[in-house]
């Protein structure tokens, strides 16, 4: 049965159509707002995936170029691999819904959101998140939602829900928040150094609107929702569980009774092997269940030690940060480099400077975007002591790179101040938690080593949460390591300067967190960030005054935009000739700004002089060194600048009478000439008289 539902949110109408499209999907809707529309479908497999010990949930956001009235470029004319924006949107959909499936539910669940029509004032990402929540809610999937999602801007001191294009361009905050009616589930934000209180208020402001969205989705579910399947939850046999816990509790406590990670890993494998061997005869096929029981037992003991005894796996207090050391200038041939180490997490970041032409133009279904600052994050398998095949970056690497890029963006100098494209690459060479935040710290150091005049240094710190649902006790942990992230309930990354927050990313494994936890976590993160910044400044406290000798020097000046065509020349002939002659790289913007890049200052200056001569208006009386390009019976044609020629009449070639032009000049000669007349049709008359001494026949 076809149904249409509408909802007013912040002055816009959201429309959902059900029962009309994709009827074989578990739950399918067309959700639209303004001219933006997405088809969102959710489907759940009937059986659990064999051998799975995790929720096999996949969320895919697809951009179709027809949504913006475009035809894909290239020979194939078909959409290719997902764009970075599409991958980040897929992650946004996944993160708030994943914790709301039952533990032990191993059926495949797939959510596909396809952007079918877009306008610039309504971004499809938040609409896709709400669409996924609705599709899952009306499907048979055992989804403990719904959730709602909004974006929040901060424009002229006011919070704005789902800001339009113009508001986004002026906003100090770009926040996406998702949650249930009771709690916040996910936060993703980039900001221009806003305070912790401003960020908290923005999150809570957004949550008030989320509550309205959730109530609306519940009415849709009540009217058209399918009956939920009874999930088959795989749990180990209770008798086996009791026996393993009794046998292994003391062993697991011993396993965790060391602050050394490597020793703990050795003990973990030893306890696992001993326990499986002990029950091998009684439970010959029970290895997987025994492993699961041991994992849960370790998690229980570890969380109890942290919450009730204040002991973390490596012996730190709840607010203590791991030992930090850093260096800069570690790679001599690069433009800037740094290594940042925090505990067993180590990241090398390399900065490369280029011309604006080296920036990235992104032409997707939204507005065409140009990026002159790019950050890439790589995490090879050796960083965790594993052996795996190398491949293209995965969703996690792309997400971490985008987070670090967002964290540094507010402090990158304006292109008028620093006319360079900047690429940062963070190589994780050792990983034990918080690698994305270490890449932010390493990026700050590498930028300063490269001589980039950043507005302020940026550091990042990852916060964790352990919550005991039975008692309500919580522990908020500063600078979490891998085990605490794996066993904990929250991964809350906060990056910023001394003045404020520049980026946030929060993922929750439980059913949301409240205002009290958010407030404490933000303040604890601020204190941790300031401590880390102090340590970083001991390595390098200001950007280097000079660029690397291997970095290009960029000469910037402006010309009349009407003269750009003259500089470029027919088919690029003029500008390519300048590049070939001087060896420089030239970029010209539509507004007339010219950027000349070269490691040779003299070559850059020569190219500038050539361009100055090209764009300079020729006037009567000018004396110019020109090149003879053609010999005519009546005189010589002289190129005064690319694309501009004049004629020296035979009677004006010399201070005395000339019988033949060839007697005085030849093609290719460079001669001084004076402009004596510029005719209405643009033709230029020249003379050599008065510029040369008496000449004889050649």
Residue ranges and their predicted role:
Residues 103-109, 144-146, 213-231, 262-263, ...:
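Flexible, glycine/charged-enriched surface loops at secondary-structure junctions
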Residues 550-554, 561-698:
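Single-stranded RNA-binding regions, centering on S1/OB-family and related RNA-binding modules
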Residues 2-5, 9-12, 26, 37, ...:
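Alpha/propeptide regions of enzymes that mature by internal proteolysis
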